[in-house]
Amino acid sequence: MNGVGVDANGEIFFQLGLSHAIGNDGEPDLVAAHKWFNLAAMKGNREAMIRRKELTNEMSPCEVSRAQREAREWIRMH
């Protein structure tokens, strides 16, 4: 867990997405990046909307579905 709560703003979620997309903690994790960009987009972050769309083009449909499920689960848990 990263300790980020539902009250976080879209910029925090966007930064988490970037971190996962470029692999700051090792290998890039596109599923996690998509999840955080999705959450940031839901908070109105336009750059996250763009990055999420770009990632979607690089991911399999299964990976996109998994990222969306993880975003919904994160919302449900927070």
Question: Where are the predicted features?
Answer:
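Short helix-capping/linker turns of helical repeat alpha-solenoids
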Residues: 3-16, 22-24, 29, 37, ...
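K/E-rich alpha-helical interaction surfaces of small helical-bundle regulatory domains
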Residues: 38-40, 72-73
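Generic structural signal for well-ordered secondary structure
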Residues: 45-48, 60
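"A position-specific structural signal for the A-helix of alpha-solenoid helical repeats
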Residues: 15, 19, 51-53, 70
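Terminal, low-structured helical/coil segments at or just beyond the last alpha-helical repeat
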Residues: 3-6, 10, 53-78
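Structural signature of tandem alpha-helical TPR/SEL1-like repeats
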Residues: 27-35, 62-68
